[in-house]
Amino acid sequence: MADDITETSQTVAAGQLRALIERIERLEEEKKTIADDIKEVFAEAKGTGFDTKAIRTIIRLRKKDQAERQEEDAILDLYMAALGMV
């Protein structure tokens, strides 16, 4: 009886593990598809004449709140002034 319970538990655990792994694999494939789509959009932007490095910077900055951006800018200005770059 105890062996049946242990075997059932192992079967359930194996099934859960398999399901989790398959979900991760599907998500990884979706992530790859999305990354390819993003790459295509950047290629389109470059083909239109936009600077993709600037676009990437803008996207990175838009993810931050205003206070965080201002703090980052202040530190950058301070460092540039210390190096005589401004």
Curated annotation (Swiss-Prot):
One of its GO terms (molecular function) is DNA binding. Pfam families: GapR_DNA-bd. Belongs to the UPF0335 family. This is UPF0335 protein mll3968. It comes from Mesorhizobium japonicum (strain LMG 29417 / CECT 9101 / MAFF 303099) (Mesorhizobium loti (strain MAFF 303099)). The lineage of its organism: Bacteria, Pseudomonadati, Pseudomonadota, Alphaproteobacteria, Hyphomicrobiales.
